[in-house]
Amino acid sequence: MRMDLDRAAEYDPREIPDEPYDAAVLIPVIERDGEHYLLFTKRADHLGEHPGQMSFPGGGREPEDASIRETALREANEEIALEADEAEVIGQLDDIRTITEYAVTPFVARVPDRSYVPDEREVAEIAVLSLSGILDPDNYEYERREHPHYGDVVIHYFRVDGYTVWGATGRIVVDLLELTTDWRAPERIDRDLA
């Protein structure tokens, strides 16, 4: 299966200007045998925030980052050894607000189909998951939860090849799929939280 990446290139993203912390992620899209794949990282178990969870390469904005896009590219280089000139940034998705007070800016990028090297300090492993696996209805579920500070929220789960993508990363995947494919989440609450 394939995404219509032109939709991401033409999209005018909504930005969240008022969060205390800025962060960015790179959504690496790989083309292999005519199908699209997404590259995820599994966070190292010793990390203080979100240990063992699946994520896209990314992190907090540093003072030396000239832009939030540069943050995404720097973090991808640090976490998976992707050189900035290897990434063809196609577009930007809506910012999402996390319960840890970050405004996360996702960037969609075509990247080469090659082996990537995880930074063992932050990344336990790299997983390249097929779009067809992500879109398989048997691999998706959601639940509504009551959050003590934010009220009713919907949590999206994508379970593919033994990996579970959920939380903020799950929200970003939902946004990407709804923009670039005909897939729609069965239920959604837009509270900008993940």
Where would I find each of the regions flagged by the language model?
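N-terminal leader/linker segments that precede catalytic domains of diphosphate-processing enzymes
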Residues: M1-S55, G60-S115, V123, G151-A194
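NUDIX/MutT-family hydrolases
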Residues: D119-D161
